[in-house]
């Protein structure tokens, strides 16, 4: 399907807008996937709140020049599907890692995180990044640990006195 100049400009603006809102991106070669497998992948992407779309590589390159994903330009060859994580850096990587376990034909070409191009081998590492809620709970646990330890330390002398008094009471009762 041929696109006119206005449609191409709109597509570049759309890609730029999506890329500017994204926290990470993944480019993958979808050669060999059936229509039903692509539909399943799209459905999973919607559920994971990951933007997934096939764009023309030339339009994606043009759009990426204005974003932090310019590093992805070198992997935009052949049939490429782009995944953009809007909220969590590891969301797209988790989605793809799970999909690859079932359908080995999806081949990751590269990941972009923080304006850096990461090789496909880093997919598992990025997928293991904690979600926002997990990261916040880990941070809360780290911040609360010293306070909890202090409270236990302050309560220990009182608890010792209580144990001694209980032992004396039990000894007198016997």
UniProtKB/Swiss-Prot annotation:
InterPro entries the record matches: Ribosomal_uL10, Ribosomal_uL10-like_sf, Ribosomal_uL10_bac, Ribosomal_uL10_bac_type, Ribosomal_uL10_CS_bac
Pfam family, one: Ribosomal_L10
Keyword match Ribosomal protein: yes
One GO cellular component, as annotated: cytosolic large ribosomal subunit
UniProt keyword Disulfide bond present: no
Gene3D superfamilies: 3.30.70.1730, 6.10.250.290
Gene Ontology terms for molecular function: large ribosomal subunit rRNA binding; structural constituent of ribosome
GO biological process: translation
Subunit text: Part of the ribosomal stalk of the 50S ribosomal subunit. The N-terminus interacts with L11 and the large rRNA to form the base of the stalk. The C-terminus forms an elongated spine to which L12 dimers bind in a sequential fashion forming a multimeric L10(L12)X complex.
Cited PANTHER family: 39S RIBOSOMAL PROTEIN L10, MITOCHONDRIAL
Function: Forms part of the ribosomal stalk, playing a central role in the interaction of the ribosome with GTP-bound translation factors.
Protein name: Large ribosomal subunit protein uL10
Gene coding for it: rplJ
């Amino acid at each position: 399907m041929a696109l006119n100049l206005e449609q191409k400009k709109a597509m570049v603006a759309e890609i730029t807008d999506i890329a500017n809102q994204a926290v990470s991106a993944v480019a993958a070669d979808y050669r060999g996937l059936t229509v039903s497998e692509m539909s399943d992948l799209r459905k999973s992407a919607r559920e994971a709140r990951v933007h997934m779309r096939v764009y023309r590589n030339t339009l994606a390159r043009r759009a990426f020049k204005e974003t932090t994903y310019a590093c992805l330009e070198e992997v935009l060859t052949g049939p490429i599907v782009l995944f953009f994580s809007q909220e969590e850096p590891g969301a797209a990587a988790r989605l793809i890692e799970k999909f690859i376990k079932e359908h080995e034909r999806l081949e990751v070409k590269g990941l972009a995180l923080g304006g850096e191009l990461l090789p496909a081998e880093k997919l598992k590492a990025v997928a293991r990044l904690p979600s926002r809620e997990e990261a916040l709970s880990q941070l809360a646990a780290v911040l609360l640990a010293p306070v909890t330890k202090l409270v236990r330390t302050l309560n220990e002398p009182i608890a010792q006195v209580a144990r001694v008094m209980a032992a004396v009471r039990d000894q007198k009762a016997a």
